[in-house]
Each structure stands twice: as C-alpha cells, then as structure tokens.
Amino acid sequence: MSVLRVGHLGICVSDMERSVRWYRDLCGFRPLTEVHVSGAESDQLLRLPGVDQRTVFLERDGLRLALFAFAHPKPVGDREPRPMNQLGFAAMMLRVDDLDATLERFRAAGTRVLDDTYTHHPGYGSKLVFLCDPDGTLIELIEIPGDPYTPFGQTYAGR
C-alpha cells in the first residue's frame, strides 16, 4: 500500500463567498463542487463538537483547494500571516509572468501585500513577494524568467 496522489490543500475561511471570489478572480482557481459537512462522523473526524461546515473545492493546474467555512464552531484565530518558521503550512506559491502588473491587480482588489517582502534576485532574474488572502493565509508570488512550466526547483538547479 502507498499514497496514490495528492487530494487537496484545505484552507479555513471566514467568508466563503469572498474567498471563492478571491481565489477564482485573482488566482485563477476554478470552482468544482460544494458539500455540506455535519453529523457525528464529521465531529469525530474533525475533532470538533457540533460541526456545521461548508466546503467548496476549487482547482488550478492540478492543485485542488478545499475552502472550509464553519458556521459551527466558529472559526478561531486572527488574520495576521503566520511566521514562516511556525510549524505547519507556511505558504502557497503562485508563479506569475509579470509580478508588478499582477500586484497592481491584487492591490486594486484590496489585497494586503506585504511590501517589505518584495525581493529581486538579479542573478536568477526572479522577483518575489508575499501577500495575504482575505483571511491572512500567506501566498507567495514569484516571477521567474524562462519556461513557465519548468518546476520551481529545476529553475534554480545548477545555478
């Protein structure tokens, strides 16, 4: 027996409609389906009492996101981005063709851009920056010259 494939990456959100719009309109994810989750099995699986939750699945480039919105119990936490050295999920990277133009689109939509993270690596020709989804989940945008379909690690290999 072995792991067969990646299923999805789950993100807890406070406002489903706002988050679906953000991931769809700004990041290009395509909504697939929606499910309602509740009942004793859900309570046991999620280790939460009285679960009442909506999940919307979105997909882009073979990556599926599962956005979780809890009516009960209410979501906890704040909208501050997690420190990169905090254990667990750190950030999702999206490759873009023109970082500066893409940032203008995100800013125009009210996205919080962490301007102090904007970095240019002349040796690689790359530019990077972090921004936050509507609930503070870190998203890294990167512009790398060359074939956009070359996996990130291969782009930097041997340099």
Regions found by a protein language model. Give the residues of each.
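Active-site/binding-pocket entry motifs
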Residues: 64, 73-74, 147
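Core segments of cupin and vicinal oxygen chelate
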Residues: 12-62, 101, 108, 122
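Vicinal oxygen chelate
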Residues: 1-2, 11, 78, 94, ...
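N-terminal beta-strand motif that seeds the catalytic metal site of vicinal oxygen chelate
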Residues: 1-21, 30-37, 42-45, 89-94, ...
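Short acidic/polar mixed-charge low-complexity motifs
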Residues: 61-64, 137
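Exposed loop/turn and edge beta-strand positions of beta-sandwich/beta-sheet ligand-binding modules
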Residues: 5, 52, 88, 125
